[in-house]
Amino acid sequence: MSRGALIVFEGLDKSGKTTQCMNIMESILANTIKYLNFPQRSTVTGKMIDDYLTRKKTYNDHIVNLLFCANRWEFASFIQEQLEQGITLIVDRYAFSGVAYAAAKGASMTLSKSYEFGLPKPDLVIFLESGSKEINKNVGEEIYEDVAFQQKVLQEYKKMIEEGDIHWQIISSEFEEDVKKELIKNIVIEAIHTVTGPVGQLWM
């Protein structure tokens, strides 16, 4: 039995990640594909993250970084097991978000990456570009929904994309929604059909 693919959607806040993940789930109706999003706010760490994001509590940046990282590690075994059982996972945000946001706040990218060493490595990361309209939507109730901060996050994403050690697929914000939906579906299907070898380890 071939393993499943780990496909991650990344991008700035309000770039359409969740929408595109749901489009994939609806267009590829199969019992071998599942959706997962981070942070998982139902866990102990997730509830702490939710309190922070919604401004109910404050933590220093180092603690916040570790909370997001721990939240992903809580699901590392689940992800590994699902992939080995032939289940493809469509993941809304992953380690790259954690690193980009931490680095945008001034943390060392190298240090932030080290917390994620060994997580299941994605077979494909789809990065959804944000047009000026989407970026200007980034004013909201949650703590990171700020235009200037999101621009900093974007620069950190670009650094990771340029490193070339992960298979990134950038989706332009200029595509019409129906074109974007079809393009992403085709990219995901190809990734599922071409995945080979054991599950890799992130940044190892």
UniProtKB/Swiss-Prot annotation:
Pfam families: Thymidylate_kin. The keyword Cytoplasm does not apply. One of its GO terms (molecular function) is ATP binding. Its EC number is 2.7.4.9. Pathway: Pyrimidine metabolism; dTTP biosynthesis. The keyword Kinase applies. InterPro entries: P-loop_NTPase, Thymidylate_kin-like_dom, Thymidylate_kin_CS, Thymidylate_kinase. It comes from the Viruses. ATP binds at residues 11-18. It catalyses: dTMP + ATP = dTDP + ADP. One of its GO terms (biological process) is dUDP biosynthetic process. Keywords: ATP-binding, Kinase, Nucleotide biosynthesis, Nucleotide-binding, Transferase. Belongs to the thymidylate kinase family. This is Thymidylate kinase. It comes from Camelpox virus (strain CMS). The lineage of its organism: Viruses, Varidnaviria, Bamfordvirae, Nucleocytoviricota, Pokkesviricetes. The gene is TMK.
